[in-house]
């Protein structure tokens, strides 16, 4: 079971709700993915006016856990204000904390992230911190009270998949008891499998499903890929070797003289 701030979930897939062709396709993708948690941008809700309100009502009817985020924020002040508004709107202390440092790469500003996390943790928020694959930053986020760390595997929307598996593996090795969720950069089901094989607790993705030719089928594919990766990790994956090792025993082999 996936444990997030004292709440347990069967699914290890979290799904974003943006960019889908229609609400009906989003609904079907959520069902096929078996996800129990979806992320929502507060800016979509507030900027959308009546349409945003309808979307929130749509999500409530799905009876699913909503994780609001601070997507689009570039400063500590913006992120803290957005988090407080999200708490009022969605009636939850959970927040996926994002503070972007560069508009082109969408790389997290880790310095502002730690500062904002410290403020929000002191005000009772349960933070899901979107960060880079830097171990030291992850440790700093833990120091200020975060319990869920969400390293990227590649830039948002890039679909490149894990490009620094050594860094991700290092975070997992040094933080064995911390809940770690891969967030951003996933492009295909095999990427999600790799993330889970590294020992990560869950995967959050959006574009790879929303922009697929068949989002509903892709959602199901990701669900199964994540299950496979988790099972492989739990089973104990054979480490790669630099030399060949025979798999066929030689006991009983005939000897000719």
Swiss-Prot record:
One of the record's GO molecular function terms: thiazole synthase activity
HAMAP family (UniProt xref): ThiG
Organism of this sequence: Bartonella henselae (strain ATCC 49882 / DSM 28221 / CCUG 30454 / Houston 1)
Biological classification of the source: Bacteria, Pseudomonadati, Pseudomonadota, Alphaproteobacteria, Hyphomicrobiales
Keywords: Cytoplasm, Schiff base, Thiamine biosynthesis, Transferase
GO cellular component, as recorded: cytoplasm
Residues holding 1-deoxy-D-xylulose 5-phosphate: 157, 184-185, 206-207
Pathway(s) the chain acts in: Cofactor biosynthesis; thiamine diphosphate biosynthesis
Stated family: Belongs to the ThiG family.
The protein's name: Thiazole synthase
Enzyme Commission number(s) from the entry: 2.8.1.10
UniProt GO BP: thiamine diphosphate biosynthetic process
Known function: Catalyzes the rearrangement of 1-deoxy-D-xylulose 5-phosphate (DXP) to produce the thiazole phosphate moiety of thiamine. Sulfur is provided by the thiocarboxylate moiety of the carrier protein ThiS. In vitro, sulfur can be provided by H(2)S.
Entry's transmembrane regions: none
Complex and partners: Homotetramer. Forms heterodimers with either ThiH or ThiS.
Gene designation: thiG
Pfam hit, one: ThiG
Location of the active site: 96
Catalytic reactions on record: [ThiS sulfur-carrier protein]-C-terminal-Gly-aminoethanethioate + 2-iminoacetate + 1-deoxy-D-xylulose 5-phosphate = [ThiS sulfur-carrier protein]-C-terminal Gly-Gly + 2-[(2R,5Z)-2-carboxy-4-methylthiazol-5(2H)-ylidene]ethyl phosphate + 2 H2O + H(+)
Intracellular or extracellular location(s): Cytoplasm
CDD domains assigned: ThiG (cd04728)
